[in-house]
């Protein structure tokens, strides 16, 4: 049986966002489920926009999500191989020279659109005479090269979309070699997939027309194309997720928002499938349940609040042994098991545990708030006797209402401020048992 090899091929021209991390996750999971390999390739032929800092950030995000790769390489290291295949395809008459300037191509595109026609290249360069070609050369124009698409049916069985069919005549022939001699993604990707024995490619459905063209490239190189799967696009408020849209970058989710790696991995691995989105604790367990056939053809709606809810579900499922190393990573190694189990149900982000610790162990300085000292003194006098429990808050506030007549915000806000120094935060009912009874009275009477 052929060994399954998948790949993830980001361009280091920006940060990873939720759309392409989903492709990375699914390629990794598919490979691991079938005891295959996962390759990380950097499509860095865009010299102007590719940056080392983006490459480093992409690797950091993948490592954070435990998407370890078996091999990695970048396209710039393979230029001599691309030249070899370029010459082969030129000999086969599957590449042809074009001399239009970017401005001329844009005028053609606008004219076609104004007539209600699809912006497909008109193959004008195929009909150039030697005299016309020589004239362009004398003008100093350098040719770019397009791949010649055969005008015939193209079809494949897609892992997600099922049977997909294209008419070669409906496809615009892509530029594969720029005027400066550098090569674009389209052909380089095919050469890499052949040389690295890629068997399966899972990517966004915005690549479907590229796949149709690349299938002809594989065939032109006498190679059977890999098996393709095209994911429906993720949308948020009726907008496609773009690489350049802020707020959906993985770095933002993990660093600024503070979400757990397995919450992010679980959510985006299952989003758009028929499987229930659950917080898995390991990539191995996630891979075991993974089924590419469960993914829908319809657009997938991404609601950030759903991801944050899943993060909460993951946190409340973690035992102390499962989280103590993570606590060290956020400099909260002082948290013990008893404290973790007490505050765990109220955590939205792991870093919230540090806020809880500070609330419970540091007497806040609230002198400047000018709180009602008489009211707080009355509240201290009716604090339930004995050990403070989760039920103490409701018992206490009922008694406070009986003696003061206060209710709602008028009742609880002064108590929250005196006890925590904050207007918002964890439920006071949950905070009380973590503070000594004597400390509660001290905070109320010294405010």
Swiss-Prot record:
Sequence motif: 'KMSKS' region, positions: 240-244
Catalytic activity: tRNA(Glu) + L-glutamate + ATP = L-glutamyl-tRNA(Glu) + AMP + diphosphate
GO BP terms: glutamyl-tRNA aminoacylation
First-level EC class: ligase
Main subcellular location: cytoplasm
GO cellular component: cytoplasm
Single GO term (MF): glutamate-tRNA ligase activity
Annotated positions binding ATP: 243
UniProt keyword Iron, yes or no: no
Organism domain of life: Bacteria
Keywords: Aminoacyl-tRNA synthetase, ATP-binding, Cytoplasm, Ligase, Nucleotide-binding, Protein biosynthesis
InterPro entries in alphabetical order: aa-tRNA-synth_I_cd-bd, aa-tRNA-synth_I_codon-bd_sub2, aa-tRNA-synth_I_CS, aa_tRNA-synth_I_cd-bd_sf, Glu-tRNA-ligase_bac/mito, Glu/Gln-tRNA-synth, Glu/Gln-tRNA-synth_Ib_cat-dom, GluQ/Sye
HAMAP family membership: Glu_tRNA_synth_type1 (MF_00022)
Function, as annotated: Catalyzes the attachment of glutamate to tRNA(Glu) in a two-step reaction: glutamate is first activated by ATP to form Glu-AMP and then transferred to the acceptor end of tRNA(Glu).
Sequence similarity: Belongs to the class-I aminoacyl-tRNA synthetase family. Glutamate--tRNA ligase type 1 subfamily.
Quaternary structure, from the entry: Monomer.
Official protein name in the record: Glutamate--tRNA ligase 1
Species per Swiss-Prot/TrEMBL record: Rickettsia felis (strain ATCC VR-1525 / URRWXCal2) (Rickettsia azadi)
